[in-house]
Amino acid sequence: MATTNHVEHELLSKLIDELKVKANADPEADVLAGRLLHRLKAESVTHTVAEYLEVFSDKFYDEEFFQMHRDELETRVSAFAQSPAYERIVSSGYLSALRYYDTYLYVGRSGKQESVQHFYMRLAGFCASTTCLYAGLRAALQRARPEIESDMEVFDYYFEHLTSQTVCCSTPFMRFAGVENSTLASCILTTPDLSSEWDVTQALYRHLGRYLFQRAGVGVGVTGAGQDGKHISLLMRMINSHVEYHNYGCKRPVSVAAYMEPWHSQIFKFLETKLPENHERCPGIFTGLFVPELFFKLFRDTPWSDWYLFDPKDAGDLERLYGEEFEREYYRLVTAGKFCGRVSIKSLMFSIVNCAVKAGSPFILLKEACNAHFWRDLQGEAMNAANLCAEVLQPSRKSVATCNLANICLPRCLVNAPLAVRAQRADTQGDELLLALPRLSVTLPGEGAIGDGFSLARLRDATQCATFVVACSILQGSPTYDSRDMASMGLGVQGLADVFADLGWQYTDPPSRSLNKEIFEHMYFTALCTSSLIGLHTRKIFPGFKQSKYAGGWFHWHDWAGTDLSIPREIWSRLSERIVRDGLFNSQFIALMPTSGCAQVTGCSDAFYPFYANASTKVTNKEEALRPNRSFWRHVRLDDREALNLVGGRVSCLPEALRQRYLRFQTAFDYNQEDLIQMSRDRAPFVDQSQSHSLFLREEDAARASTLANLLVRSYELGLKTIMYYCRIEKAADLGVMECKASAALSVPREEQNERSPAEQMLPRPMEPAQVTGPVDIMSKGPGEGPGGWCVPGGLEVCYKYRQLFSEDDLLETDGFTERACESCQ
């Protein structure tokens, strides 16, 4: 018997290896590889609830619920294993199956893993037992869903939403929900005191290490660093070492994003920590900038004006102010001569751009937008740090801030998407405000659509369930540190590009833009409604509510000029009256995170982004797996497959007739980035935290610094909070192609193949680190005293040799300024 099992194991492994490498060209091979991986793992997972409890009972925080309802749970799990929902899960492809077994399924005694069925049972059981434990939470759920009465009906409510994947949870929740003494918070933010060597030691070894040990992504404010005279690069390397230690051999790698304001005297050294040519770079962490509005105004209006730099110990209250108060303090310090250096603001901007193009970061956030749109006044205690993915915004000086995340799988909200009966709201039961809203979006499907429309009712049901899931996570996920009472929630989405494509639209078509706003307005409205119900019945109102803007009838969209509402203002007014009367359980609601992990499980596109590619690869903990665009292949005609495979699924490379047929599957790099920025602005009034808004540039566009700089300015002008999460560059030469397209290569004349060398397709060659000591050092000296005796810029005449400090060709542009060497450089 053992020999038979061994032979079967070897055969399955060989078949999987042969099929998984065809995933980007053959969707059936991808599905079959995933199903075979589930079959391969069948002997190493739990099969019955009794076996599951025997293996994992010592790990549960509430074993009683599972023991009490063992037979009923067995019935539910067995029925799920025979259902269309389970069939869809195991048919989601190889990468989906790999993510389950590699990351999410809990491992017990002797290496035994929970099965996919028991994984969802654990998540739903945690939510159900927590809901039953807190009488107020259960009362709120019964007010929202009056048909729910028994404990098992509470379980069914969560189980069917989770297994139908309308609600997708964060990685910490999927890995640890129901496990005793686990941290379920997704994000941690801290702005520690870094003014002395002792403070830095405490922050790193007493606090940061603990957060990383609990597998949380961390955002750290480091603007206060450097007051002890030490270089910021030393601090960054210490943080990087922490991250690398905790990630060694770890299933779920974690990281840190360090945030600084650009007036800091060591801003250039901070940027250099991520440059690839820096031999002391910090690859394990990310950098971010909280940029004041003044910086963008000066760059746009007077780009060669000076930007002054300050030692943080002489910077007064700059770190704690924003807006006009910041500007007054900045110019007061300049007038008082408190600055320690100055630099052309354009040179600093292009240093930021240079770093973004080469390293993908720094993340860039607009300080005024982040603080001015917060639910309370932050003047004098302004936040200047975000989380790891730049979408969670909370003050984190006085105490550590946390946030619990979940997201809605938007393709499951299409009218024709199969759902369990309990996941659909009855027309006559539930929250009267939600029942007053339309069930369907008024936008009509386009030509070639396979969807019959978008169900706003399903979206609201999913959002309501996600709000209850996060409430369970907050109430029972131990510990959530000092910020548990703030009950910060971040609901995001995945699969927005899939929805647009299935409805027959390109990502930036007018119907897409209309539905884009409608989706997030309904999510924000539903989250507020549900949070108010939970607050009323649990009698847990977040601290500071009475002093918050919400207590005065405010909504986040009030601060955004020209906001068009699809929900009638009269219904918004009724919600406002309810909130003023009953309060809110949560202090924050919508945060659009990247969702890259859970989107691999569902097989949908990431977050709210356009398709990244129709054929790509994804590096997991154990291997580099192919990731096909499943929506794309659902729409591809059989007679077009060969042509599409020859170009790796790139629509822009197809002949015109074929290109027109598949235009809605253009990638993010094919779209005008200003259109994508505008769509982020359209949904911004309903995103009370922020959105991980990335920019997608082709290599030839990224070679001109003005391209990215202009996009950053445009995002500032539109008032986005996160101006840029990540800068992604599409290489002109695709080095990621894993299958040789011999026939395609033969069809191209040899002289055309050799027309451009790989070197000609690269970005400008980076300078050697030794050549650049940083503009701060230059500006501290007089003319002709920079590195190598070169000059410093002044007035409108800019020495081209100075520009060569940053680039050897067009990375910095003259924009019409005189290009000649000055006397000290000739």
Swiss-Prot record:
Enzyme Commission (EC) number: 1.17.4.1
Sample GO molecular function, one term: ribonucleoside-diphosphate reductase activity, thioredoxin disulfide as acceptor
Site residues, Important for hydrogen atom transfer: 187, 403
Signal sequence, start to end: none
InterPro entries referenced in this protein's UniProt entry, alphabetically: HSV_RIR1, NrdE_NrdA_C, RNR_lg_C, RNR_lsu_N, Rrm1
Catalytic residues (UniProt): 387 (proton acceptor), 389 (cysteine radical intermediate), 391 (proton acceptor)
Gene Ontology biological process: deoxyribonucleotide biosynthetic process; DNA replication; release from viral latency
Intrachain disulfide bonds: 187-403
Transmembrane segments annotated in the record for this chain: none
Record-linked Gene3D superfamilies: 3.20.70.20
Binding of substrate, residues: 171, 186-187, 217, 387-391, 594-598
Marked site (Important for electron transfer) residue numbers: 725-726
Family: Belongs to the ribonucleoside diphosphate reductase large chain family.
Classification via NCBIfam families: NrdE_NrdA (TIGR02506)
Name the record gives this protein: Ribonucleoside-diphosphate reductase large subunit
Protein's organism: Epstein-Barr virus (strain GD1) (HHV-4)
Gene from which the chain derives: RIR1
